[in-house]
Amino acid sequence: MATSITAGLQKAQQAVQDTATKNKKIVDISHDTVNVHTDQEQRTDFGVAITDPDHWLRVTNETHSGPSLLEDHIARERIHRFDHERIPERVVHARGTGAYGNFTLKESIEDLTYAGVLTDTSRNTPVFVRFSTVQGSRGSADTVRDVRGFAVKFYTDEGNWDIVGNNIPVFFIQDAIKFPDFVHAVKPEPHNEVPQAQTAHNNFWDFVYLHPEATHMFMWAMSDRAIPRSYRMMQGFGVNTFSLVNKEGKRHFVKFHWIPHLGVHSLVWDEALKLAGQDPDFHRKDLMEAIDNKAYPKWDFAIQAIPEEDQDKFEFDIFDATKVWPEEQVPLRVVGELELNRNIDEFFPETEQVAFCTSHIVPGIDFSDDPLLQGRNFSYQDTQISRLGVNWEEIPINRPVCPFLNHNRDGAKRHRITKGTVNYWPNRFEANPPASDKGFKSHPAPITGRKRRDLTPKFKEYHNQAQLFYNSLSEVEKVHVKKAFSFELDHCDDPIVYERLAGQRLAEIDLPLAQAVAEMVGAPIPTKALRDNHGKTSVRLSQFDFTPKAPGIISRRIAIIIGDGYDKIAFNGMKAAILAAQALPFVIGTKRSAIYAQGEDKNSSKGVIPDHMYDGMRSTMFDATFIPGGSHIETLQKNGQIRYWIAETFGHLKALGAMGEAAQLVKEVLGNVMGVQIAGADSAEPVEWYGVVTARGPESAESLSEGFKVLKDAGDFTSKFFYQISQHRNWQRELDGLASTVAF
């Protein structure tokens, strides 16, 4: 039974949450929301009070417990309900998480569309967003190498509009008819159901080699885009080509983009592998944590638009989902902003039962002849019926916030009761008539041609944009692509698979890349390019082109490692500075019981209770680590896991801060690294070396927590340390070969 104090606190917290984040959709689902934290007695689903939920009705006497009785309707109901709790998981995108928020239009695009959600800047449109992986099952890990789903449901005044996108702007196939074969190939192999949530197996690489249209996409999949640091730090793309139609009936073809305010950042591969076991829920917890801490994730909403009459003016077909529209040719126009500000209350009825459809569009938005989109429009509707039943749009999370009524009736799991004597149109009462002027109208696009199974010649060019993407990457991103191919193909044990992918297909993209990968995986090393690299580059294909909208360390997770005898001044000052910068400090102790500062009397001080002890966490779960000085360093020096934590932080290219005696510990751990530079006890200024920031102990906590700025050339310790965190990683540490000299 909930205590009155607990219930009161929860009620107050809920009131604050509701006031800050309430919108039309939150109000709508509130009618179907109940709170289990109540003194209300248990009842069956048919309303009968339950007096004993712990014992099945059975025949007993003083010495013997006899058979259970099937007449126990309460027990049977509980078992029946339990036996049927699971529903079919999504065939793809099964693993996911979601949150509520709002979409705000910053600039009307009435020159392109008459859709209210894209023309009325006074609106605040509720949204639900679901992020996901593609390949794995519901129980797979968050940090696998994979495309990420980025699906947005807008609850507009004219109906629901869904952008069912990904964090990569292109796809593996051009025609939806190939989707079953592609998914079969990327999923676990049929003879043994292995591997889970990975492309590192024979069937996937066999399929993509035999489908050269997949070349561009698998270059993206081998890049850092496929291992994002956070859902909050990845782009989103509509992938397909849609249409916008304005009041004059003029049509533009468009692509949709989401650009994160925090910039685009990724994990490193070793880190992603480890997190898959250490914290398989890393991404979903990261999203919930940020929202709970009011570090609300935000994205700019942008479009690319091509007038209908210009659709044939490009070297690529604009309806080909394996191609991007280079921004030099089709500029990006930022028109809105997405903010996520409310976590879900219950996973199953909200995140698991939410259902997206590419065919969910509103007046002013239309489809195109994109052959992948045409098939998706059928598939998504069909799969929701299989998963949730024909009345899936009556489920609270899926229903629109605008009034809706039609003559659809019956079917499994129908909830709505429709009064009236007719269920058809036209009818003698003129009841529930079609919309007059405000309804959806398909654009009257002219179509000529012959019925055949084929695509236009432009679809058959597969290499130019794969080269364009690779050419546009930074040096370190190219290193990661090479390593990713080497890892993936090393897991293929059929020589024909890795030999022709490394020695032939990659030689059509970039010869040095093909040679490096072939050598690593044991394939014949190609001696000449099978296709000349055109040498062209394009902006904003490298994720390094997407820096945070404002410099800072907001929502970054920073570990502070302490043991008995830590420097209290350094600890208090750094923790205060981290909080002031709107980042998240986590105290990692040698134990999760009271830890006392150097000179503190255990009898007169409460000490500090760490958030975690070191063995319960790993450096992989944090963006940076800080270690204050003090006599506790004598204890930390003898702890192998703490030493490994420091080495792993360095190996994963993260910022590392140490003061006083801790600087010497860092130097000891990094002893094999050439040229390590740290601050000595008499150093007047902090020392920054490849993202490792050290200094002598501070004179006061305020010297750390006040007056800092996130600037590269700042002179104080905090500013230098925070700047390194803001850069996400010290990539030069990897390029100069320093990270690889440390065992981690």
From Swiss-Prot:
Biological process (GO) annotations held by this record are: cellular response to heat; cellular response to hydrogen peroxide; cellular response to iron ion starvation; hydrogen peroxide catabolic process; response to oxidative stress; sporulation resulting in formation of a cellular spore
Q: Which CDD domains match?
A: GATase1_catalase (cd03132)
Primary place of residence? Answer: other
* Residues given in the record as heme binding sites: Y380
**Entry's localization field:** Peroxisome matrix
Catalytic residues as annotated in Swiss-Prot or TrEMBL? H93, N166
**Keyword Iron attached:** yes
Q: Which GO-annotated molecular functions does the record name?
A: catalase activity; heme binding; metal ion binding
* SUPFAM superfamilies in alphabetical order: Class I glutamine amidotransferase-like (SSF52317), Heme-dependent catalase-like (SSF56634)
Cofactors required: heme
**Role noted for this protein:** Catalyzes the degradation of hydrogen peroxide (H(2)O(2)) generated by peroxisomal oxidases to water and oxygen, thereby protecting cells from the toxic effects of hydrogen peroxide.
Query: What is this protein called in UniProt?
Result: Catalase A
Name its species: Emericella nidulans (strain FGSC A4 / ATCC 38163 / CBS 112.46 / NRRL 194 / M139) (Aspergillus nidulans)
Gene encoding the protein: catA
